[in-house]
């Protein structure tokens, strides 16, 4: 439609119908950070306009304003400005601010991808972490099985990338993943992913409020007889069988700092080595954090978006 012309309602309905046929994909903020201060409303007023200043102070969201300052400050090293080919976003998880930036350095002309834990407490690095090697790490075996319910036209939250059958997943209406690694794994099997929780956890930005137009039910794919509560109804597709190998046992009793990728692993580990509760522990910001923080005080539990970040900050 040309600007200023009267809208043909018949053509508009046809356009809307065709537009809705497109698959909607919301890209992850960890890979595609937004422009600095994106979404914040700026307003100019005179220095002596006290009335306007008082009104703005009443409605201003101070936490968001502070995040905007951090994002703009990050761009200052290149002179700032909207013309920079750099995205930067600050997110807050359990009182820990994380800055994610990606783009092209105007000085070196090279592309970069950076993640910084801004409010990170200084941590003394150690020589022995758990797990020390993800390739050799094993606390459970997963026995893949058929889906416990039909997936046709359902909205799904995928937490793992391995499945006994892929075709049933292609019949789903909408697919979200718990993180970007799961997204990449299932995408290799020909699945179109519509969005991801980005490793921030199920409660950070609920799927039905942020990632879907229709507030219809979402089902979480998980393991059978999962006794831990989820905000989503579940569909099982594998069994979790305790099976800890020799490398992991040795690593478990040698480690000084621990990163937990699931509460199940944490629960099994403290049965084998109870003094882990007095050691340094860390995990992601989602359900694992929520469950472990009921056992270990939150102030003693570090939060990292993934294992690689934990390794970067805690391994000497």
Model-derived regions, located:
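Small-molecule-sensing regulatory modules
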Residues: 1-125
């Amino acid at each position: 439609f040309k600007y200023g012309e009267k809208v043909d309602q018949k053509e508009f309905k046809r356009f809307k119908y065709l537009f809705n046929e497109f698959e909607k994909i919301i890209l992850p903020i960890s890979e595609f950070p937004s422009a600095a201060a994106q979404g914040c409303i700026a307003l100019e007023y005179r220095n002596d306009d006290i009335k306007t200043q008082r009104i703005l102070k009443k409605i201003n969201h101070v936490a968001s304003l502070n995040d905007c300052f951090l994002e703009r400050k990050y761009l200052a090293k290149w002179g700032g400005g909207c013309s920079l080919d750099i995205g930067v976003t600050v997110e807050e998880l359990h009182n820990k601010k994380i800055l994610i930036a990606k783009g092209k350095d105007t000085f070196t002309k090279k592309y970069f991808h950076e993640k910084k834990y801004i409010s990170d407490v200084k941590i003394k690095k150690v020589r022995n972490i758990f797990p020390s090697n993800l390739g050799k790490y094993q606390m459970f075996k997963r026995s893949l099985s058929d889906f416990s319910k039909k997936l046709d036209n359902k909205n799904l939250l995928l937490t793992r990338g391995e499945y006994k059958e892929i075709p049933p997943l292609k019949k789903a209406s909408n697919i979200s993943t718990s993180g970007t690694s799961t997204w990449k794994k299932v995408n290799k099997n020909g699945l179109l992913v519509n969005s991801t929780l980005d490793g921030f956890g199920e409660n950070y930005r609920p799927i039905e409020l942020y990632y879907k137009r229709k507030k219809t039910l979402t089902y979480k794919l998980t393991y059978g007889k999962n006794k831990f509560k989820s905000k989503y109804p579940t569909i099982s597709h594998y069994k979790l069988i305790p099976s800890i190998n020799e490398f992991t046992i040795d690593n478990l009793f040698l480690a000084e700092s621990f990163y937990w990728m699931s509460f199940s692993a944490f629960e099994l580990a403290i049965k084998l080595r109870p003094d882990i509760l007095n050691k340094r522990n860390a995990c992601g910001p989602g359900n694992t954090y929520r469950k472990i923080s009921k056992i270990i005080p939150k102030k003693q539990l570090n939060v990292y978006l993934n294992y690689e970040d934990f390794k970067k900050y805690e391994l000497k």
